[in-house]
Amino acid sequence: MYGQVQFGDSVIVGEQCVLGYPKEARLQEAQDGRHSTGDPVVIGERAMLFNQVVIHEGTVLGNECLVEDRARIGYGCEIGERTRVVHGAYICDRVRIGVDACVAGFICDATVIGDRSTVMGDLVHEYTRPDLGWWGADEAPPVIESDSVVGFGARVVGGVRIGPRSYIAAGAVVTRDVPAEHVVTGINIQTPINRWAGRRLSALIEHWTKPQATTARS
């Protein structure tokens, strides 16, 4: 462990995990003989970290989160309750993920992923200004709104927004905003879910669009 780590009750930590690893700027300060303490890592109650997990300083994991083997979470991230980080996922810095989500693949800096969303593909910056250096460019990140899916091998590029209850098919490429309740295939081919004729998504679309039960008030 590097720095301070705060554990909730009944947390499980596997073998060879690294918690509270300093961000790059703090390591550079140490090379110059200047030492400082980063923000603590906070692990919520009943969270589970499997083997060889790396979590950088200042990251907060909500209650009952699960982080699988060899996943990496950068500094200053916020991971909501009951979210699963799948094995080998690479989550960069300052990423915000909601509750009950499932995340794999590569997630670039400052990405926002909404509640109950599933991201199996890659969310990346455009990286159009390499001349400014690695830390010189400040690009807008992708935003994945609640209840959306990014399939395996799909790639969302740049500061685009994926609307709620949208489905990015496996292998698709997205470089522009996607409205709510759309399916994206190929390269930016968008189809409203009420016009989607495929059978494989029919159950999910029905789940998204069925009327929500309401509780009668006394």
Model-derived features with residue positions:
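Short, glycine/charged-enriched secondary-structure capping and boundary segments
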Residues: 116, 183, 198-200
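Short, isolated positions within intrinsically disordered regulatory regions of eukaryotic proteins
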Residues: 9-11, 200, 212
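Glycine-rich, phosphate-binding/catalytic loops in enzymes
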Residues: 84-85, 184, 201-203
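Intrinsically disordered, low-complexity terminal regions
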Residues: 208-218
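Flexible, glycine/small-residue-enriched loop-and-beta-strand segment within the central core
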Residues: 2-6, 10-159, 187-188, 195
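A glycine/serine/threonine-rich, flexible loop-to-helix segment
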Residues: 194-207
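C-terminal/domain-terminus segments
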Residues: 67-69, 161-185, 190
